[in-house]
Amino acid sequence: MKEKREFRDYLSDIFDAIEKIENFTQDISFDAFVEDEMRVFAVVRALEIIGEAAKNVPLEIKENYPSVPWKEMARTRDKLIHSYFGVDLNVVWKTVNKNLPPLKDQISEILKDLGNTSS
């Protein structure tokens, strides 16, 4: 039987997926990225995981951290899942380089804030 997950698990999933994306895209140009099918697939999958995890974070947590782009994460996941063959890699690359660094900091802060509280 599947173990029940706590909301912190989903926050950790987001953080871990961001770190994986950082590793997948470290020291690589956009041109090299788009030519590397495995890397593209891995990054897109990690973005899907971020969005799916965001959907599972309780509303109370989302309301306590309104500056986190919860809806945007979920929408990105939906766009990737439902239009995979139409994925714009320019948008993916921009998301990776512009949106994920501040998101990583936000999720890290939330995890620190919630570290000593019970779920």
From Swiss-Prot:
Classification via InterPro entries: HepT-like, HepT_RNase_toxin
Reported modifications of this chain: Modified by cognate antitoxin MA_102; probably at least 2 successive AMPylation events occur on Tyr-84.
Pfam (any one): HepT-like
Entry GO MF terms: nucleotide binding; RNA nuclease activity
Enzyme Commission numbers on file: 3.1.-.-
Motif RX(4)HXY motif, residue numbers: 77-84
GO CC term, one of those recorded: toxin-antitoxin complex
Catalytic center residues: R77, H82
Keyword Cell membrane: no
PTM sites of type O-di-AMP-tyrosine: Y84
Keyword annotations of the record: Hydrolase, Nuclease, Nucleotide-binding, Phosphoprotein, Toxin-antitoxin system
Role according to the record: Probable toxic component of a putative type VII toxin-antitoxin (TA) system, probably an RNase. Probably neutralized by cognate antitoxin MA_102. Neutralization may be due to AMPylation by MA_102.
PANTHER family: RNASE MJ1380-RELATED, UPF0331 PROTEIN MJ0127
Family affiliation: Belongs to the HepT RNase toxin family.
Oligomer and partners: Homodimer, probably forms a complex with cognate antitoxin MA_102.
Name used for this protein in its record: Putative RNase MA_0101
